Amino acid sequence: MADLRVILRKPTIADGDEFINAMKASRRFHRPWVQPPRSAAAFTAYLKRLRIADHDGHLVCLRGSGAIVGVINLNHIIRRAFQSAFLGYYAVAEYAGQGLMFEGMQLTVRYAFRRLKLHRLEANIQPGNSASIALVKRCGFLREGFSRRYLKIDRQWSDHERWALLAENWSAHDTA
């Protein structure tokens, strides 16, 4: 993992301007898949949500320059018998297609399974989002099903494919 081009780090209020500018510049790229925070108030609300026990999130940043290339969140972390979380993620358009989110996802999966001791990660992806589906496939996620009108995005209910990765399946592929 030492040869990765990215690192994960927790977002802070100091990231606000860079984050907001990156999300505004990526608006077309994100539509219709996701609506990340694009204002100071929305970014502050995002930071506040990450302080809740069942949410965790990281910026994916270039090693060296620290530029934000994406975001990966672990949402609705459920403990006890479930030990699971739902992934949410998005790239900054300028850095898309370079494999950087794949590297960030590798680090996130490692963090979730090793540090947080989760058993299952789930990603719910709109069927037309081929880049996102390719990312989770490359990371070892398996398609488990289809959820009709699963999530409301941009004021419309959207169908999603359900993809999941279990800790025991990941550990067989983890070489670091």
Where is each model-derived feature located?
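Conserved GNAT-fold acetyl-CoA-binding loop/helix
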Residues: 28-47
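A short helix-loop-beta-strand connector motif used in the catalytic cores of GNAT acetyltransferases and
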Residues: 48-59
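A generic secondary-structure signal
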Residues: 46-49, 111
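Acyl-donor (CoA/ACP) binding surface of acyl/acetyltransferases
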Residues: 1-18, 22-27, 61-176
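Residues at alpha-helix boundaries and short interhelical turns
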Residues: 34-37, 54, 78, 95
